Regions:
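Peripheral, non-AAA+ core regions of ATP-driven protein-machinery
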Residues: 1-214, 218-224, 261, 326, ...
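Basic, amphipathic alpha-helical bundle interface domains used for macromolecular binding and assembly
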Residues: 41-46, 61, 68-78, 284-285, ...
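Short loop/turn elements that form and flank the Walker-type P-loop nucleotide-binding site
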Residues: 60-63, 100-101, 131, 150-151, ...
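P-loop NTPase nucleotide-binding/switch module
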Residues: 168-205, 209, 237-290
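Walker A/P-loop
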Residues: 214-255, 320
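The Walker A (P-loop) glycine that initiates the GxxxxGKT/S ATP-binding motif of P-loop NTPases
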Residues: 217, 280, 302
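Walker B catalytic acidic pair
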Residues: 295, 301-303, 313
Length: 506
């Protein structure tokens, strides 16, 4: 048999399209030709596969070899095609006799010794193979990842010889051990934060409803400390969420996907991060920070120091929960459903009023002008974190609640939302808000008048209603009351600050 066909999977974002490896041996001058839009890393497979076959006790065919990676229009990169190419060569040269090739897919890089190495994107490949009705063989380096899927459709091996013996019916391959769904509770606790009761209340609301939060305050008041406590208030990842997050992480960091797959992601990029680093990029786009924060938290400290175009690029993903990256060689969609938490100083000197203020209203407004209005509109809550009052440090943390206590209320509020609308309040669409966020007529009139006075947009009105709905859920109340709306309005610090500065300049 001079022709062999082996199935494998490409890595194209979180998708894994089927790739057919076709190998044909013919008479002629010995040589190897590889077609099907392979990258340089794929072309290097000829040397790796040759050495792996020889060191595994097989002969490299001394014939004219043509290898086709179909379909030809899909770009291919990386060493993930080594194992299927080696198997196809062995079958085509009749060194391996098997009739079971069409029942399996193979993904793995080969060492020169014939050992198997892990590849990025093993989870999407395994899920797509199972969906197609085939089993998949991967390296034991990827065992922890594909073990998240469970079942016996994923098999692991350490060496090319093991795979060949399995296909010949001489031995069996074992499935990966399924990971125990244990929670990782190593989160920082709210008890560490002294004072800042309104900030803690805002964190509870944000955790319960999935809202975005902007923290404004002078340096050293605990903005970053508060933000880092949010993951400890959130529920653990569900099985589906864990798979989604692990699939994204496996594209860029194998170690993280193995060891931290149950933790909600908490990404805190530096303010010098580029547009490509934040939203994703490359000739074949890789996920950026917003996708790595999927199902978790994206924390942006020193918000005005980020490039404006980087921040404005976040506007669409915040609304849609995904990012579409178009490049000349590939167009890829990545999920990006994250909670945005940001922190900033109110002025370039850190203060905008009081004895510490050294900036004029014009300088402060120019500083805040780095943030576009549409971007600020994406925050459901904005809160001022003031300097602690005198005496608070000597009192310690008396009567403070732990993250575990607050988390119980958060879980109860989330359960109410799931029973009512099967999604968090922050993700409610306009038509759903009519049923879930109903107001009494007098409250609706009062809210509209208040928004007109503050000069807020319709988007801000929608976000206010969602926050009020979450406050009502935390209070275990069915209808939104006036005091829920008043508390939601109290979390509009950025609007009050801008109005105050404009009055000072008038």
């Amino acid at each position: 048999m001079s022709l062999a066909i082996v199935y494998t999977r490409a890595a194209l974002g979180i998708e894994a399209p089927l790739i057919t490896v076709e190998v044909h041996l013919s008479n002629g001058l010995p040589g190897l030709t590889m077609v099907g839009l392979p990258e340089t890393t794929v072309k290097e497979a000829r040397d790796r596969v040759r050495s792996a076959l020889i060191n595994s006790g097989y002969a490299f065919p001394a014939k004219k070899i043509t290898i086709n990676l179909a379909p030809a229009d899909l770009p291919k990169e990386g060493g993930r095609y080594d194992l299927p190419i080696a198997l196809a060569l062995l079958v085509a040269s009749e060194q391996l006799n098997t009739t079971r090739l069409n029942q399996y897919e193979f993904v793995g890089e080969l060492a020169l010794t014939g050992g198997l190495r892990g590849v990025p994107g093993a989870i999407p490949s395994a899920m797509e193979a199972i969906k197609a009705g085939r089993r998949i063989v991967v390296s034991s380096d990827n065992a922890a990842e594909v073990g998240l899927i469970g079942g016996s459709d994923c098999l692991v091996a350490d060496h090319l010889q093991e795979v060949c013996a399995f296909l010949a019916g001489q031995t069996s391959l074992s499935p990966p051990l399924a990971e125990a769904p244990a929670r990782d509770e190593r989160y920082e606790d709210l008890l560490d934060v002294i004072g800042q009761q309104q900030g803690k209340r805002a964190l509870e609301i944000v955790a319960a409803g999935g809202h975005n939060l902007l923290l404004i305050g002078p340096p050293g008041t605990g903005k970053t400390m508060l933000a880092s406590r949010l993951p400890g208030l959130l529920p653990p990842l569900s099985n589906q969420e864990a798979l989604e997050s692990a699939a994204i992480q496996s594209l860029v960091n194998l170690h993280t996907a193995k060891t931290r797959w149950r933790q909600r992601p908490f990404r805190a990029p530096h303010h010098s991060a580029s547009l490509a680093a934040m939203v994703g990029g490359g000739s074949i786009p890789v996920p950026g920070e917003i996708s790595l924060a999927h199902n978790g938290v994206l924390f942006l400290d020193e918000l005005p120091e980020f490039e404006r175009r980087v921040l404005d690029a976040l506007r669409e993903p915040i609304e849609s929960g995904k990012i579409h990256i178009s490049r000349s060689r590939a167009k890829i969609d990545y999920p990006a459903r994250f909670q945005l938490i940001a922190a900033m100083n109110p002025s370039p000197t850190g203060h905008y009023q009081g004895k510490h203020n050294r900036a004029s209203p014009e300088q402060t407004l120019r500083y805040l002008g780095r943030l576009s209005g549409p971007f600020l509109d994406r925050f459901d809550l904005s809160l001022e974190i003031p300097l602690p009052p005198p005496g608070i440090l000597s009192q310690g943390s008396q009567g403070e609640e732990s993250s575990a206590t607050v988390r119980q209320r958060v879980l109860a509020a989330r359960e109410r939302q799931m029973l009512r609308q099967n999604k968090l309040n922050a993700h409610l669409e306009n038509r759903e808000m009519k049923n879930c966020c109903r107001l009494r007529r007098e409250d609706a009139v009062w809210l509209e008048q208040t928004l007109t006075q503050l000069g807020l947009s319709i988007r801000a009105w929608q976000r206010l209603l969602k926050v009020a709905r979450t406050i009502a859920d935390l209070a275990e109340v069915e209808e939104i009351e006036r005091y829920h709306l008043q508390e939601a309005l109290s979390y509009r610090a950025i609007d009050r600050m801008l109005n105050h500065l404009q009055k000072m300049m008038a």
